[in-house]
């Protein structure tokens, strides 16, 4: 192909199709009105997604697949970091108490309470993330709401 030869969009699509591993995937097509497509595509681009990825995210959400947003991920990481710190604190306090039973037992109790609260927060967050039936209901509600 010379450098002045123009590649058509269908050739580009064929070349992309050849380079992708499509094994295990099903191709789904949908007819959209021009305004629907333009709005959808614009929204996908704002999020940095291709049209295909945006459709896949929507399908996964409706199907109840696990998707964790950045805020939830940050919250989980903060809780896990807190649990790690609290665990170290409790361990150090218990070691100090074992060496000298006159050490501050109240500090051990306070750290233990905070540790339990952090675990409860993590448990609640994980339950909301992992609740398959709730995710499917949420996704189906989105779909029904769109109809």
From Swiss-Prot:
EC number, as in UniProt: 3.1.-.-
Entry keyword annotation includes Hydrolase: yes
Keyword Iron: no
The protein's enzyme class: hydrolase
Superkingdom in the source lineage: Bacteria
Molecular function in Gene Ontology: endonuclease activity
Keywords: Crown gall tumor, Endonuclease, Hydrolase, Nuclease, Plasmid
Endpoints of the signal sequence: none
Functional note: Tumor formation by A.tumefaciens involves the transfer and integration of a defined segment (T-DNA) of Ti plasmid DNA into the plant nuclear genome. The virD operon encodes a site-specific endonuclease that cleaves at a unique site within both 24 bp direct repeats flanking the T-DNA.
Name this polypeptide is given: T-DNA border endonuclease VirD1
């Amino acid at each position: 192909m010379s450098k002045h030869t123009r590649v058509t969009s269908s050739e580009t699509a064929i070349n992309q199709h050849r380079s992708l591993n499509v094994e295990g995937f099903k191709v789904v097509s949908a007819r959209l009105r021009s305004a629907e497509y333009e709005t959808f595509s614009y929204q996908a681009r704002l999020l940095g997604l291709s049209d295909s990825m945006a459709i896949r995210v929507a399908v996964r959400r409706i199907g109840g697949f696990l998707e964790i947003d950045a805020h939830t991920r940050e919250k989980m990481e903060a809780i896990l970091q807190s649990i790690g710190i609290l665990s170290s604190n409790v361990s150090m306090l218990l070691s100090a108490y074992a060496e000298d039973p006159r050490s501050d037992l109240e500090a051990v109790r306070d750290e233990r309470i905070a540790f339990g609260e952090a675990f409860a927060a993590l448990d609640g967050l994980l339950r909301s993330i992992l609740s398959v039936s709730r995710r499917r209901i949420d996704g189906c509600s989105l779909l029904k709401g769109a109809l």
